[in-house]
From Swiss-Prot:
NCBIfam families on file: A_tha_TIGR01569
GO CC annotation: plasma membrane
The protein, known as: CASP-like protein 1D1
Source organism, top-level taxon: Eukaryota
UniProt-listed InterPro entries: CASP/CASPL, CASP_dom, CASPL
Coiled coil segments of this chain: none
């Protein structure tokens, strides 16, 4: 009987050990992982919200002299919606801001429990998608901002930031925040992809 009890206890211990999650899998379920994910998504929300507010308020009107008529000044406005690239950046920041809010709520729910593998995989795909959107929008808007700052002598495009200083500061700040948002999305992708990698081991 003692032998049977020992064997039964041994088998029960093996079954419990097999049922227990492996250390790599458990590492992805701790609150530290979900906490880091939530913090990055909250930061992404703040950055994209600030970026779209700064860009939406990018407008300035200045009085420009007419060379043909000395003493005559003409009011010329500069707004973000005068450039398709800046409109694209505003839309990208808007949808990314909404996405970060939704995924932050999802991450908040996962703090108290484990994160399903399917959820992590979906987050990786979506983070990659939005990182690509933000990177492309930031790149196109950055090109427009650079031309406004430096001009282009080959195409005779004159710089305007020496005239529309406040407008260009808004554009530059929004482009910088778009770059920060892209980096945050890359970090989120790495974080969730690493967790999936740990679970597969």
């Amino acid at each position: 009987m003692a032998t049977v009890d020992v064997d039964t206890t041994t088998e029960s211990g093996k079954a419990a050990a097999a049922a227990a999650p492996s250390p790599p899998a458990a590492a992805c379920r701790r609150s530290s992982f979900s906490g880091a994910d939530l913090a990055l998504r909250a930061l992404l929300f703040a950055v994209t919200l600030a970026g779209l507010i700064v860009l939406a308020t990018a407008k300035q009107t200045v009085s420009i002299p007419v060379p043909e008529i000395p003493g005559l000044l003409v009011s010329r406005p500069a707004k973000f919606n005068h450039s398709p690239a800046l409109i694209y950046l505003l839309v990208a920041q808007c949808v990314t801001c909404f996405y970060s809010l939704l995924t932050a709520l999802t991450s908040l729910k996962l703090i108290s429990g484990s994160s399903p593998t399917k959820t992590l995989f979906l987050l990786v795909l979506l983070d990659v998608l939005y990182a690509a959107i933000m990177a492309s929008a930031t790149g196109s808007a950055g090109g427009v901002a650079w031309i406004g700052l430096k001009g282009n002598t080959h195409t005779n495009w004159t710089k305007i930031c020496n005239i529309y200083g406040n407008f260009c500061r808004h554009i530059g700040s929004s482009v910088f925040l778009g770059l920060v948002a892209s980096v945050i999305l890359v970090l989120l992708t790495i974080l969730n992809a690493y967790c999936l990698y740990r679970r597969s081991r």
